[in-house]
Curated annotation (Swiss-Prot):
Part of a two-component transport system composed of TsaT and TsaS. It comes from the Bacteria. Involved in the uptake of p-toluenesulphonate (TSA). This is Probable inner membrane transporter protein TsaS. It comes from Comamonas testosteroni (Pseudomonas testosteroni). Belongs to the 4-toluene sulfonate uptake permease (TSUP) (TC 2.A.102) family. Its main location: membrane. The chain crosses the membrane at residues 65-85, 128-148, 160-180, 186-206. Keywords: Cell inner membrane, Cell membrane, Membrane, Plasmid, Transmembrane, Transmembrane helix, Transport. It is found in: Cell inner membrane. Induction: Constitutively expressed. GO terms for cellular component: plasma membrane. The keyword Amino-acid biosynthesis does not apply. It is a multi-pass membrane protein.
Length: 239
């Protein structure tokens, strides 16, 4: 079933706006425009929109945290490609949604806490899950936020670092999916040319709004949007 243009445009602009605040990638698109039927488009939008977002906050990017995620993410992308033909996607999306909702609720309830790095194996598993999710669902952003919240204390650092991780994650996913012939090039690129300016507009609008929001309020907004993204993912179990 096709998504009405007005609704799709709203979802795209919302994703760009959402992305500037928090950088969560496809979460808003998934909720607003039926993500599971447009994964190639979402991933292709992730790269330029996240580059714009990251460029606007370049000085606050924490590169060491990105380097710690990269190896597991690359391996996870290959695992995700294999899993695409093996699993019913509804249950993984449901479980992911529960986890993201829990992370958002914990952040909303407890506020700012000292960053505590995850144990080595747990961090690598989470990094691998980022690659799996980006390839299978184009919605790894909430998981990236959950990981970075355990490594970075300042919300501004998280907001700046997430889109850089998403540029890399989406680039890996695009390479893997193109190599496997999983992206319909003709239709996807045609829609991409139309959707990209709308996503950029959302990023710019979010940029202006974010200047007037204090860090505690930004952290609460992050938590609320994580909860919204998580709950939207759980709905796929009944579709």
């Amino acid at each position: 079933m096709a998504v009405p243009r007005q609704r799709a445009a709203g979802g795209l602009c919302g994703d760009g706006h959402h992305r500037f605040w928090l950088g969560p990638g496809g979460g808003a698109l998934l909720a607003g425009s039926g993500r599971c039927r447009g994964g190639g488009l979402v991933i292709l939008l992730d790269v330029p929109a996240s580059m714009l977002h990251g460029g606007l906050n370049f000085r606050q990017v924490r590169w060491r945290a990105i380097g710690a995620i990269l190896p597991g993410m690359a391996v996870g992308a290959l695992i995700g490609l294999w899993l695409m033909g093996q699993l019913d996607k509804r249950w993984p999306l449901f479980l992911l949604g529960l986890y993201i909702t829990w992370v958002g609720w914990r952040t909303l309830r407890h506020g700012q806490q000292a960053a505590r790095a995850l144990p080595g194996w747990t961090h690598h598993a989470g990094s691998g899950l980022v690659g799996v999710l980006e390839v299978m669902f184009a919605t790894a952003g909430p998981m990236v936020i959950a990981l970075l919240q355990r490594r970075l204390r300042e919300v501004a650092e998280i907001r700046a670092t997430v889109p850089v991780v998403m540029v890399v994650a989406a680039s890996i996913a695009i390479a893997v999916l193109f190599g496997a012939g999983q992206i319909d090039r003709a239709h996807t690129f045609e829609r991409w040319l139309v959707a990209l300016p709308i996503a950029f507009m959302g990023v710019v609008l979010g940029n202006r709004l974010a200047r007037h929001i204090p860090p505690p309020a930004m952290r609460r907004a992050m938590a609320v949007l994580l909860i919204a993204s998580g709950l939207s993912l759980t709905q796929h179990l009944w579709r």
